[in-house]
């Protein structure tokens, strides 16, 4: 009986550690800090963000995108997905640091006015200061 209890405990601990490792690896994918710039501050949080960091996975962003309203073309940009948590104090042209954030819940009311944005959308968390390595 003791052997059966010991074996069951060992299995549970192994499964628990495996889950922790998988969770840790997923978090590592989104833990890098990047530098970006708010390129367009369109109405109703239709924001376009440019990537300034060389270590960013550019497959997550639009390689090139043209704003239909101005005709200006941007490189390595994405649409803001985290509309509820993006600081209002950041204006077009401002540079800031951010991490990718797939965990934040975005349940705020946002108006439906349209302004063109890139086809790729990312949720981010703006950092208080420069990235710490």
In which residue ranges do the predicted regions lie?
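Sec-dependent bacterial lipoprotein signal peptides
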Residues: 1-19
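Bacterial Sec-dependent N-terminal signal peptides
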Residues: 13-37
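First exposed extracellular module after export/assembly in secreted or surface-exposed proteins
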Residues: 28-133
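Residue-level signal for functionally critical sites in structured catalytic/ligand-binding pockets
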Residues: 3-4, 24, 44
């Amino acid at each position: 009986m003791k052997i059966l209890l010991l074996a069951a405990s060992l299995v549970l601990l192994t499964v628990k550690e495996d889950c922790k490792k998988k969770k840790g690896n997923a978090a590592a994918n989104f833990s890098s800090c990047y530098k970006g710039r708010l390129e367009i501050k369109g109405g109703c949080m239709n924001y376009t963000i440019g990537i300034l960091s060389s270590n960013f996975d550019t497959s997550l962003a639009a390689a090139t995108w043209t704003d239909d309203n101005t005709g200006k073309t941007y490189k390595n940009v994405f649409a803001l997905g985290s509309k509820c948590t993006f600081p209002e104090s950041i204006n077009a042209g401002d540079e800031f640091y951010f991490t990718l954030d797939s965990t934040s819940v975005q349940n705020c009311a946002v108006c439906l006015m349209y302004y063109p944005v890139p086809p790729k959308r990312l949720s981010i968390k703006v950092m208080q200061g420069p990235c710490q390595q």
